């Protein structure tokens, strides 16, 4: 096939214009095209007010080399179709079924691959099925009554279920895992456009249905799910995993245990540390969730002409400060909501979430400041966890259990806000005005303020006085890394640390890909379960 890149078209182009552009670029006629597939679609707004839609497409034709040479198009090349392949099965025999702890993206894709290959994984998830979990989350947002085992962090689908559902990743993968993840989502009900949009997202409403369909397929393939079953201990002998304890009262023997923990499984981290599993603190970032009117972001990114025509615009901003800290946007949610993402009593954390239509009137993003183990006495592997907890306890107290909010101008002046400016907050969960100064160290607070002013050089009025900040954004990534070797095993053999909670991913797609890598490691070593 021939891949043609840099096909620029007007924002409001027709299908006919799209085909004509391809025909012209390759100097071919319509009937010569046997098959066509969009590889990438992006918005180019670098030369505002002119904005273009840019495509890369794969075109199947006869006599590819001849057509390519005749076209003289420097943006066209012959490529071979790349399909993901599962490795050859190993020779060792299982005595017991492999266990996967956690049904987030890493755990689900690990279990899916194992189930497809006949390994009959047994998945333990402390939370509930996604439908029941959603009911618990909505109840929490309405009443403030938290279920510590079923919330925005815990339950089928993992923390990404209640997010923007972004599927882009910076992970380079020549083996095709990235495409396999996207194609798998499509096969379970996600829109096909996620396979080619430059910044794909799925939305929490669609993602919930996709996750449920994926679970049903894993069950059909011989896997098993045990919901509301938390792994509370492990049994180790001769530095090998022998069994896992469920809910403090039952043991399940296994020689393979995939730790697909989320970044909020703090009690599990504590339990694992006591067993002698090697783990270490890692750098992460904390800050606030910041809201702006989405229309203003659209104007900045697309220009006035296309502010209403195009989809809700994302942004990405970053600054490296003189004090050595980085300040940057994270998990930006166009047309999104700020949500109460707490999972522990008397502690409060926020996150951002969008539905598939990205229809909220506000844009929000975490604006976060980098922290290192030096900021939280990183001598203990779980010192970062305690740092997060202290921040969340302060946030809970500031809002009396509600999301504490403040206008950016008032934050700069160190005074409590009493009302919104010309736009109000879009939240899921109750809110209360508070003075958020004092939540972080003076240096971190000044870094946040400096970063906000810096970003206004790129996005006008980013530092507007009535921008709404909500605290605290503390769960940006795992504060620990569970060490693993080149075959993905921990120092306790048979334990496979995996995904975001173990410190090897950041986001839905990279976590899913890491789950696949761990499944491949198990497949290379063992025969399918008999």
Predicted feature locations:
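Residues forming the flavin
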Residues: 3-53, 57-184, 188-530
């Amino acid at each position: 096939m021939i891949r043609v890149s840099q096909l620029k078209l007007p924002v409001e182009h027709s299908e006919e214009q799209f085909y004509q552009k391809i025909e012209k670029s390759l100097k071919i006629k319509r009937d010569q095209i046997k098959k066509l597939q969009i590889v990438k679609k992006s918005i180019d707004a670098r030369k505002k007010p002119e904005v273009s839609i840019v495509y890369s497409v794969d075109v199947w034709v006869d006599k590819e080399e001849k057509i390519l040479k005749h076209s003289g198009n420097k943006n066209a090349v012959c490529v071979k179709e790349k399909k993901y392949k599962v490795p050859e099965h190993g020779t060792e025999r299982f005595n017991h079924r492999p266990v996967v702890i956690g049904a987030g993206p890493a755990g689900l894709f690990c279990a899916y691959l194992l189930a497809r290959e006949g390994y009959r994984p047994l998945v333990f998830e402390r939370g509930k099925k996604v439908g029941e979990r959603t009911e618990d989350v909505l109840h929490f947002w309405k009443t403030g009554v938290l279920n510590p085992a079923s919330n925005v962090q815990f339950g089928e689908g993992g923390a990404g279920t209640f997010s923007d559902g972004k599927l882009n990743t910076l992970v380079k993968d020549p083996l095709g895992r990235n495409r396999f993840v996207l194609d798998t989502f499509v096969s379970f009900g996600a829109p096909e456009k996620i396979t080619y949009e430059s910044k794909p997202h799925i939305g929490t409403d669609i993602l919930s249905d996709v996750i449920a369909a994926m679970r049903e397929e894993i069950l059909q393939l011989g896997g098993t799910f045990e919901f509301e079953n938390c792994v509370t201990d492990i049994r180790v002998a001769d530095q090998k995993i022998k069994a896992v304890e469920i809910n403090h009262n039952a043991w399940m023997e296994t020689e393979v245990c995939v730790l697909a923990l989320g970044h909020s499984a703090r009690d599990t981290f504590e339990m694992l540390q006591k067993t002698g599993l090697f783990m270490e603190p890692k750098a992460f970032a904390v800050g606030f969730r910041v809201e702006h009117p989405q229309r203003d972001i659209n104007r900045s990114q697309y220009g006035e002409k296309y502010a209403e025509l195009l989809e809700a615009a994302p942004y990405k901003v970053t600054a490296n400060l003189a004090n050595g800290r980085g300040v940057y946007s994270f998990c930006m949610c166009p047309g999104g909501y700020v949500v109460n993402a707490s999972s522990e009593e008397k502690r409060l954390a926020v996150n951002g979430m969008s539905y598939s239509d990205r229809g909220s009137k506000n844009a929000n993003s975490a604006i976060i400041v980098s922290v290192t183990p030096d900021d939280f006495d990183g001598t203990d592997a779980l010192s970062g966890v305690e740092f997060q907890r202290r921040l969340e306890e302060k946030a809970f107290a500031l809002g009396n259990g509600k999301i504490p909010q403040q206008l950016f101008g008032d934050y700069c002046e160190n005074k409590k806000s009493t009302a919104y400016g010309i736009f109000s907050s879009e939240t899921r969960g109750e809110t209360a005005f508070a003075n958020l100064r004092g939540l972080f160290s003076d240096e971190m607070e000044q870094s946040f303020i400096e970063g906000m002013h810096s970003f206004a050089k790129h996005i006008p009025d980013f530092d507007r006085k009535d921008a709404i900040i909500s605290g605290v954004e503390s769960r940006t990534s795992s504060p620990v890394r569970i060490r693993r070797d080149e075959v993905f095993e921990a120092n306790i053999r048979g334990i496979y640390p995996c995904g975001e909670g173990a410190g090897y991913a950041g986001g839905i797609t990279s976590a899913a890909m890491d789950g696949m890598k761990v499944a491949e490691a198990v497949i290379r070593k063992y025969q399918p379960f008999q």
